[in-house]
Amino acid sequence: MKKWICMLLAAMMVLSLAACGGNQDPQQENGTQQGDTQQNEQTVDLKQAAEDAIATLGDEMPLFPVEDAAELEGLYPGLTAVETKQIVAYQPPVSGFGCELVMVEVASAADVETVRGILQQRVDSMANDTGYPENTPAWKNNSAVTVNGNYVVMGVLPEGVTLPAAFKAEF
């Protein structure tokens, strides 16, 4: 359980550091600007960040990638219609288990709220799912949808693992 918290905190830290990267002033040499003014954008490889975080769980809590667009659309209706730079989703091998990780980098800041709403709808619907009542506490009490710049992350922890207050406050 502690490994899961560490995984989520590591993923959130990577995203927060990426959001801190901003525009840099154009480099100057001999008092003149070189080239066009470019914005240096920092980005996070969400797939690698998620895989690194999931690796810390070991065999205790396996999560597998969801890569099929139709499956993504079935789980998160409307998500595939949003223009994204990156999207990774991980689920356990057993349906209904209260443990998921979704990380999205949207192409436009205007889409952040749309993605946040889609992921929050997933949390809300699973929290009220009568098909898997044993997992309801995880969705009600141990889930978070966070936004940091153009990144939106949804994490759900198994029952018995609580989100640290610092984690909730940061995201």
Spans of model-derived segments:
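A short, solvent-exposed beta-edge/loop patch
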Residues: 94, 135-171
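Second-shell loop/turn segments in exported
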Residues: 100-108, 151-155
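C-terminal motif of bacterial Sec signal peptides marking the signal peptidase cleavage site
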Residues: 15-19
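Short, compositionally biased low-complexity segments enriched in polar/charged residues
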Residues: 63-98, 110-111
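Short Gly/Thr-rich strand-loop-strand
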Residues: 109-149
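Positively charged n-region of N-terminal signal peptides that target proteins for export
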Residues: 1-4
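Extracytoplasmic/secreted envelope proteins and their assembly/folding machinery
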Residues: 47-54, 112, 116-120, 164, ...
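N-terminal, intrinsically disordered, polar/charged segments of Gram-positive cell-envelope systems
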Residues: 6, 21-74
